[in-house]
Amino acid sequence: MSSARTPLPTLNERDTEQPTLGHLDSKPSSKSNMLRGRNSATSADEQPHIGNYRLLKTIGKGNFAKVKLARHILTGKEVAVKIIDKTQLNSSSLQKLFREVRIMKVLNHPNIVKLFEVIETEKTLYLVMEYASGGEVFDYLVAHGRMKEKEARAKFRQIVSAVQYCHQKFIVHRDLKAENLLLDADMNIKIADFGFSNEFTFGNKLDTFCGSPPYAAPELFQGKKYDGPEVDVWSLGVILYTLVSGSLPFDGQNLKELRERVLRGKYRIPFYMSTDCENLLKKFLILNPSKRGTLEQIMKDRWMNVGHEDDELKPYVEPLPDYKDPRRTELMVSMGYTREEIQDSLVGQRYNEVMATYLLLGYKSSELEGDTITLKPRPSADLTNSSAPSPSHKVQRSVSANPKQRRSSDQAVPAIPTSNSYSKKTQSNNAENKRPEEETGRKASSTAKVPASPLPGLDRKKTTPTPSTNSVLSTSTNRSRNSPLLDRASLGQASIQNGKDSTAPQRVPVASPSAHNISSSSGAPDRTNFPRGVSSRSTFHAGQLRQVRDQQNLPFGVTPASPSGHSQGRRGASGSIFSKFTSKFVRRNLNEPESKDRVETLRPHVVGGGGTDKEKEEFREAKPRSLRFTWSMKTTSSMEPNEMMREIRKVLDANSCQSELHERYMLLCVHGTPGHENFVQWEMEVCKLPRLSLNGVRFKRISGTSMAFKNIASKIANELKL
């Protein structure tokens, strides 16, 4: 395989040719069998192993996919492993999946989730990506409400830098929205979900109409062809408005109403929005796509650079890869790798275990860990090959230089195609902007070798616990590619005067009904007009089976019967007109009842269980983890951890919540009725706050809608007497 990265071939949007593994072919690694053969049988440890990874827990699931939190055995680094069942996908979906993987391999930006390794067998594809412990921007807004402009600017500079980087590589994302913006442990942005991304060439129009309706450009609603970048620019305008106002500029009770508002291009300007921010919005939200600003122009905008006058935002320059770091090379040699195979894997960009190990060694998982690395010798081939199914094909591996690499698992679990990611942290130089972030099982991630983020610092508020999903799973192919959305006829051909910006925003004291507030930052929400599993949030795709014209007048969240019976994984109580596959696997399909086993195992307060006397003693002597996470004064205390756990259990019981003790100071909690919109699962953990003589309660959502989680989490937090 050539050491140079080959350009991605342009794909016909409507091509449905069955992809062969030749699309991603590469020379088999000498380690391939080892990766697939190492499993739980090879270790005395009861936790399952995949290759060089120990699977810790499921952090996301969907109809055809699971995402697992895993630990790289050789370096101790945590990774996210997405397991995709290819047998559930048709040829068109497979083609899009492989295109997504190829595109992610060429992206190396500190604010884009990094794909680290790809393993392919005959039936399953495993993607190993960064693990974003901070959850989605969507969840952050639900928990905290709108951002102050300083904080929004910090996030938005990172978003624009990453999207402009994609555009300069002639890649368009096409599904930018708050749900696809992740936060790492330091609250830096990571753009995820390249399932609808594609290459573009100016002059050759794209004609696939996809995206999430509130973020979709007007030309998509009109069924017009487009170059590519201009649809991302419109979506960025919606994102900016959402960050600053906590609401959407365009919304409606059904798709028809939403479409009409987008095509009018009118939105309200809240009284608290600065004039500079309002002027910047006018460069994004222009009905005529040819008149929208380019991201290079937007980088020079006044609002974008307030507080950064000496550091104007500029296009990101990708650093040269570092394939000859003597420290990492020597460490790998001590593990049993040879210098030749290390160089071959890196230069050939193979995305194999060798490259993954090298890249993982380049990063420390947490500032709290420092640079200490616990290294283990490489498993012998004899040990790991005994039960290895030989994969008939392998995915090409080509990695950019400095990502935190992680490997994927080869366990036969259902999976959904998507290129999701998990976030590597970019460096923030402004100490006053640091804040405790929510940490879901992994400590704050930090990057040693990755170039610093385009943003020197992030301002952050200390408020209520952030509902973090920890796994942002995107769904590229699994977004119902077979479920219709906007077809040109059904959307109609409303005419818009070209060359005329009809936005004419009006200032009003509060957001208008068309701009539904996501949440307020105080107290439990009284409204649920920013739900996750409804059509207004769902990503749509041309060529889906259901006809929009039959649904345009239905309220969001009401789904007509599917003529094909092809409803894949709805996230809301009753699903949505568009398959909610881009939202993420973390949201379980609430139409399907929770498995009996799952509910029955969540008995209240199961402590300790069986085990040896030694294990029980270790359990009793365990101490809370020292973590950085989003906390508030209501959930911190100088009480002893055991007293805090008793208080938490008391409040959970009072609110009819089931709980199960997973670790000494961590409870898995469930509230609501399986199969209903109020059903939610989350973790509550008593943690020690670093550098403070206080303990705090960490909340982390596992599944369920953002609003359902916020309702119960806020109620419990308010009732805790800590």
Swiss-Prot record:
* Compositional bias annotation for Low complexity: 511-524
Record GO cellular component, one term? postsynapse
UniProt's post-translational modification comment states: Autophosphorylated. Phosphorylated at Thr-208 by STK11/LKB1 in complex with STE20-related adapter-alpha (STRADA) pseudo kinase and CAB39. Phosphorylation at Thr-208 by TAOK1 activates the kinase activity, leading to phosphorylation and detachment of MAPT/TAU from microtubules. Phosphorylation at Ser-212 by GSK3-beta (GSK3B) inhibits the kinase activity. Phosphorylation by CaMK1 promotes activity and is required to promote neurite outgrowth.
- Which parts of the sequence bind ATP? 59-67, 82
Membrane topology per the entry is: Peripheral membrane protein
Q: Which residues are modified to Phosphothreonine?
A: 58, 208, 275, 294, 464, 539
Q: Where is the active site?
A: 175
UniProt lists compositionally biased (Polar residues) regions at: 27-45, 417-431, 464-483, 492-505
**Does Metal-binding show up as a keyword for this record?**
yes
Cofactor needs: Mg(2+)
Query: What family is it from?
Result: Belongs to the protein kinase superfamily. CAMK Ser/Thr protein kinase family. SNF1 subfamily.
> How the protein assembles, per its UniProt entry?
Homodimer. Interacts (when phosphorylated at Thr-539) with YWHAZ. Interacts with MTCL1; the interaction is direct and increases MARK2 microtubule-binding ability. Interacts with PAK5; leading to inhibit the protein kinase activity. Interacts with MAPT/TAU. Interacts with YWHAB, YWHAG and YWHAQ.
Tell me the function of this protein: Serine/threonine-protein kinase. Involved in cell polarity and microtubule dynamics regulation. Phosphorylates CRTC2/TORC2, DCX, HDAC7, KIF13B, MAP2, MAP4 and RAB11FIP2. Phosphorylates the microtubule-associated protein MAPT/TAU. Plays a key role in cell polarity by phosphorylating the microtubule-associated proteins MAP2, MAP4 and MAPT/TAU at KXGS motifs, causing detachment from microtubules, and their disassembly. Regulates epithelial cell polarity by phosphorylating RAB11FIP2.
UniProt remark on domains: The KA1 domain mediates binding to phospholipids and targeting to membranes.
What's the protein here called? Serine/threonine-protein kinase MARK2
